[in-house]
Amino acid sequence: MTATKQTAQVTAVADGTVVTPKGFQAAGVHAGLRYSKKDLGVILCDVPASAAAVYTQSHFQAAPLKVTQASLAVEQKLQAVIVNSACANACTGEQGLKDAYEMRELCAKQFGLALHHVAVASTGVIGEYLPMEKIRAGIKQLVPGVTMADAEAFQTAILTTDTVMKRACYQTTVDGKTVTVGGAAKGSGMIHPNMATMLAFITTDANISSAVLHDALRSITDVSFNQITVDGDTSTNDMVVVMASGLAGNDELTPNHPDWEHFYEALRKTCEDLAKQIARDGEGATKLIEVRVRGAKTDEEAKKIAKQIVGSNLVKTAVYGADANWGRIIGAIGYSDAEVNPDNVDVAIGPIVMLKGSEPQPFSEEEATAYLQQETVVIEVDLHLGDGFGVAWGCDLTYDYVKINASYRT
C-alpha cells in the first residue's frame, strides 16, 4: 500500500499538534515519577476512534504494550492513551502487568471510557516497578484540553533523555473536507526501531477503518520510524499508535478512494518528520545524517544498506569529526548482506563525489570538511544494480553520548 508518484496536496501546519485534528484533547502533569518535570500524560478522543498500532520486536516486550494489544484486540477502537515516563515497566513480571492493567482501569474510570478503549504506554528505566500511588494520584490531576499549552504538557510528559519536544502536523483535502494529521513523539537513545525504541502518538480526524489504517501505518513505519538509528539498541517498550476520530466528515477512506494518496502522504510526512526529529535529537548528537541509496536490486536492499551506513559507529564518528573518510561508508556497504557489485559503486558526501564506478575521485578536503560541519549531512550511494531506493536517518556519535548513558540512572 503506497502513495502514487504524483505530488499529493499536503501542507505542513507549523503550530499543529496532536490536538489540532478534530475531536482530540491532551494533558500532562507532574505525578512525582521524576524529580520536577512532567511525567504523566494523556490523549483523549471525543469518540471511540479507529485505531492501529505497531510494536517493538524485542523479546522482552513491556507490560504496557501487552495491555494495549489486549485493548485493540476487542474492536480495534481507542478513545485514550495514557503514558508515563521515568519508568518503563519492563521486565517486571506479573506485578508489572497488573500495574499496567490498573493504569488502563484508572484512565477509563477517570474519563468514563470502556476499558478496551484505553491504550497504555511507558518509557524510562527498565526493571523498576511503577510507583502506583503516584500514578493513581496523577491520573486524577489530568484535565485534557485543546490548547497548544495542553499539547505541550503532554509532549513534555513523555520525554526521557530528549532535549526537545517532537511534534508534527500536516493537512490535506479529502472529498473537499480538510483532513488533519498530528503527531507527538519521544526518543533520543536506544534508537534502532523494528518497530522499537521510541514512542509516537498520531491523531487524525480522517474517516477511515481500523483495518485500512493499520495497513497504511505498517507500510509507512517501514520507510520512516524503522529507518532511523541512533545507537543500534532496540527498546522493550516502544510503539506507534494512531487514532482516527472520523470527524473531518469525509467519505470513508480506502486505497481506492480518489483522494487516498492525499491522506497517505499526510500520514507519511507526519511519521517521517517525527522520525527525523528523533534522529536529530540522538543523545549527544550535533548533526542529522541522511543516507540515500539508489540503484539497489530492490527497495528493501536499498533501505537495508542505508540503515547499515547510518548505523556505523565509524561513519558516525567521522561525521562528528568532519572527516571525509569515505572508506568507512564503503566498509559499511561491504558487510551488508544486500547484493553489491564492488566494481561499480558511487559515493558522494553532499555535492562532493568521492567514488565513481568504484574509482576514487579527486576532491577538496577543505570543501568536504566545510560541508561536514553543517547541521545536516547527506550521504548518497548508487549501486547501479536496479531501481531500488531507500533512505535512512541517524546522527553523529559524540563524547556526550557516553556521558549521558554512563550516568542515566544517577
From Swiss-Prot:
The active site is at 197 (nucleophile). It catalyses: N(2)-acetyl-L-ornithine + L-glutamate = N-acetyl-L-glutamate + L-ornithine; L-glutamate + acetyl-CoA = N-acetyl-L-glutamate + CoA + H(+). It is found in: Cytoplasm. Heterotetramer of two alpha and two beta chains. It comes from Geobacillus kaustophilus (strain HTA426). It comes from the Bacteria. Its EC number is 2.3.1.35, 2.3.1.1. The record marks 123-124 as: Involved in the stabilization of negative charge on the oxyanion by the formation of the oxyanion hole. Pfam families: ArgJ (PF01960). Keywords: Acyltransferase, Amino-acid biosynthesis, Arginine biosynthesis, Autocatalytic cleavage, Cytoplasm, Multifunctional enzyme, Transferase. Catalyzes two activities which are involved in the cyclic version of arginine biosynthesis: the synthesis of N-acetylglutamate from glutamate and acetyl-CoA as the acetyl donor, and of ornithine by transacetylation between N(2)-acetylornithine and glutamate. SUPFAM superfamilies: DmpA/ArgJ-like (SSF56266). The keyword Cytoplasm applies. One of its GO terms (cellular component) is cytoplasm. GO terms for molecular function: glutamate N-acetyltransferase activity; L-glutamate N-acetyltransferase activity. The record marks 196-197 as: Cleavage. Pathway: Amino-acid biosynthesis; L-arginine biosynthesis; L-ornithine and N-acetyl-L-glutamate from L-glutamate and N(2)-acetyl-L-ornithine (cyclic): step 1/1; Amino-acid biosynthesis; L-arginine biosynthesis; N(2)-acetyl-L-ornithine from L-glutamate: step 1/4. This is Arginine biosynthesis bifunctional protein ArgJ. Substrate binds at residues 160, 186, 197, 283, 405, 410. The keyword Acyltransferase applies.
